[in-house]
Amino acid sequence: MTKVRIEPGICGFTAIAEAEAAEEDFMVHLRVASGCAAVQEMMKALGSTFSAFAVCLTRPGTGPFYAYAAEHFPVHAACPVIAGITKCTEAECDLALRQDAGIFFEE
């Protein structure tokens, strides 16, 4: 199992994503906990089992989470939660190496 903490910034809705690879067909089971109602509704609507290829091996801004967000999320293009869910899935399914990522403001 792979677990990541996603700190989105000023909204304060920290998200915890957990991914567990299934043994067949590059499927992954995801659990995402967040105080954000939009993220909660997304996970409720999409379910918890996904093709790792459909989540990770897509062009930027595509895949099931971005497609849902484009239709249902409030306007906030910089929300890092979906990228965090994707990184968690990549690492769990051996589609990318584990490495922290971040956005840091510099003076």
What are these regions (language model features)?
Residues M1-V28:
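Short, charged/polar N-terminal "headpieces" of proteins
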Residues T14-A15, H76, L95, I103-F104:
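Polyanion-binding surfaces on beta-sheet-dominated domains and ring/shell assemblies
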